[in-house]
């Protein structure tokens, strides 16, 4: 369960980073 949360947070941060680069 903890690993799942960590994966989710990593994915969210990755998506936010991509958005920051695009915009």
Curated annotation (Swiss-Prot):
* InterPro entries the record matches: Circovirus2_Orf1
Q: Which domain of life is it from?
A: Viruses
Instruction: Cite the Pfam families for this sequence.
Output: Circovir2_Orf1
Q: What does this protein do?
A: May play a role inhost modulation. Is not involved in viral protein synthesis or DNA replication.
What name does UniProt use for this protein? Protein NS0
According to its UniProt entry, this protein's organism is Porcine circovirus 2 (PCV2)
Gene that encodes it: NS0
